[in-house]
From Swiss-Prot:
Source organism (scientific name): Alteromonas mediterranea (strain DSM 17117 / CIP 110805 / LMG 28347 / Deep ecotype)
Keywords: Ribonucleoprotein, Ribosomal protein, RNA-binding, rRNA-binding, tRNA-binding
Leader sequence segment: none
Sequence similarity: Belongs to the universal ribosomal protein uL5 family.
Domain of life (superkingdom): Bacteria
PANTHER family assigned to the protein according to its UniProt record, in alphabetical order: 60S RIBOSOMAL PROTEIN L11-RELATED
Coiled-coil regions, chain positions: none
GO (cellular component) term, any one: ribosome
Subunit structure: Part of the 50S ribosomal subunit; part of the 5S rRNA/L5/L18/L25 subcomplex. Contacts the 5S rRNA and the P site tRNA. Forms a bridge to the 30S subunit in the 70S ribosome.
GO biological process: translation
An example Gene Ontology molecular-function term: tRNA binding
UniProt protein name: Large ribosomal subunit protein uL5
Family matches, as Pfam families: Ribosomal_L5, Ribosomal_L5_C
Function of the molecule: This is one of the proteins that bind and probably mediate the attachment of the 5S RNA into the large ribosomal subunit, where it forms part of the central protuberance. In the 70S ribosome it contacts protein S13 of the 30S subunit (bridge B1b), connecting the 2 subunits; this bridge is implicated in subunit movement. Contacts the P site tRNA; the 5S rRNA and some of its associated proteins might help stabilize positioning of ribosome-bound tRNAs.
Amino acid sequence: MAKLHDFYKETVVAELAKQFGYKSVMQVPRIEKITLNMGLGEAVADKKVLENAQADMTAIAGQKPVVTVARKSVAGFKIREGYPIGCKVTLRGERMWEFLERLISIAIPRVRDFRGLNPKSFDGRGNYSMGVREQIIFPEIDFDKVDKVRGMDITITTSANTNDEARALLDAFNFPFKK
């Protein structure tokens, strides 16, 4: 079992229950899933781009990504309905906890010119979204084999009802928010 999951069960649940005055431990917010999304507009012209992005995402997440397709045709972007334009992975359970551990302790500290995560990136319902500009911050990606530096969106979905509860949950995991 992931260390972060044990830490959550043993320490964070008790802290948050005390802080917010929950009557039951089942009311304490928990992380439900982490979604990684990589939008690849250039995949329309070159299919190899999508394959490379899928390989990178498989290495980062530890599971095969799903190819996302265009829902509508947009002439301005030269895409038609059904064209592959990205890939995404939804992590739950054990893989989610292991990824979160790697994200907090290894990947985020490797970001260049890092000044902290934006505390305003909560959506109002207790979910947090962040962008990563380069996939090479993850140790699983070999810098020499990368054809192009790509970014991705990381969304952390929690069971929290408010932003304050979600912020307290992520703070308990030592997320490096800006002060």
